[in-house]
Amino acid sequence: MSALKNSLDPVQMLCLDGDGIGPEITAATRRVLQAVDDCFDLNLTFTTQDIGFVSLAASGTTFPDKVLDAAKAADGIVMGPVSTIDYPPASEGGVNPSGFLRKKLDLYANIRPAKSYEGLPPRVGNKVDLVIARENTEGFYSDRSMFFGRAEFMP
């Protein structure tokens, strides 16, 4: 991803809808980001590229090269969930978008907040307010959809 420029330049956000509920999640995220932009004049601009099953049907791969080019040019990426467990083998176009982006853009942290909100009772146990930081400085995450390859597997 590109480095942020001066505050007057547009901030290029790339939206990757993903599979299943991904389009719904990225649309909601985009609305939130637009509301933040309206309040703080961040000058966000949004573009969308297809990944996942939509891309597989259109181009023969779940992550086309043009998406990587767009990701490298973007200042930020919003990516919805993907159904990697259901993808065909890589030899048939089933590339794991999140793993591919992580490797190609040298990303090493996955931040996952979890918080209980008033009016929504917790399903199990007590309320929570935590952030899980999953780092990847040793070179790989275990990938549940990979059964062979570069030491990234879960039997």
Roles of regions detected by a PLM:
Residues 21, 25:
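Conserved phosphate/anionic-ligand binding catalytic regions in large, soluble enzymes, centered on
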Residues 49:
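The conserved SAM/SAH-binding core of class I Rossmann-like methyltransferase domains
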Residues 26-37:
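Short, polar/charged alpha-helical segment
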Residues 2-20, 38, 44-45, 53-155:
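Anion-binding alpha/beta catalytic cores of soluble intermediary-metabolism enzymes, centered on
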